[in-house]
């Protein structure tokens, strides 16, 4: 069973989605799978999808879940601040940015760029590694999917309400680790 939200920029109402919409959709999917199978669910997700899994599990208080497995989904966002910017400064700036994101989201190209800026040295090393191996097709082929993804294939836009809420709750205030994030008006830990 797979929950795929599609590319918000291509889905009707996709750019108006909130973080709560995504978390409740995952929770609803758990209920539907349990109804079909009669069994509890192993919930898994990658990147932001994994964070939705964490959030849905907390929202449900793990009811109906056997396990949660995530890949590339930080529970602690404090180590993600790039360029050595102090976390308290970054938190205040991101809070201000989130307050002003209510009118516009983040296009897919900006999502890709933002990801690369989280670790600019790693991005640069990856680029240099690729260029130095251009002569060796066999060395490049196993990583082609990853290269295409990091170059921009597969990135989607962030809806403004979901992005603002994510930045405010999980980046500026690190609520995934600290607890106390809000889903559908309910405080969740």
Q: PLM features: residue spans?
A:
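Conserved alpha/beta-hydrolase
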Residues: 1-10
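Conserved serine/cysteine hydrolase catalytic core
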Residues: 155-189
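A generic local structural motif
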Residues: 27-31, 54-55, 182-188
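Generic structural signal for hydrophobic core residues of well-folded globular domains
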Residues: 33, 56, 170-174
């Amino acid at each position: 069973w797979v929950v795929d939200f599609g590319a918000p920029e291509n889905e009707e109402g996709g750019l108006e989605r909130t973080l709560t919409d995504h978390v409740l959709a995952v929770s609803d999917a758990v209920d539907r799978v349990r109804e079909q199978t009669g069994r509890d669910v192993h919930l898994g997700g990658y990147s932001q999808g994994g964070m939705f899994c964490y959030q849905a599990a907390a929202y449900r208080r793990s009811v109906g879940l056997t396990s949660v497995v995530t890949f590339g989904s930080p529970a602690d966002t404090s180590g993600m601040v790039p360029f050595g910017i102090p976390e308290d400064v970054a938190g205040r700036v991101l809070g201000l940015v989130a307050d002003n994101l209510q009118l516009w989201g983040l296009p897919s190209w900006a999502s890709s760029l933002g990801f690369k800026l989280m670790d600019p040295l790693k991005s640069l090393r990856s680029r240099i590694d690729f260029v130095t191996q251009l002569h060796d097709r066999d060395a490049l082929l196993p990583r082609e999917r990853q290269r295409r993804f990091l170059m921009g294939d597969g990135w989607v836009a962030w809806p403004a309400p979901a992005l603002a809420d994510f930045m405010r709750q999980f980046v500026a205030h690190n609520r995934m680790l600290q607890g106390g994030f809000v889903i559908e008006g309910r405080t969740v830990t």
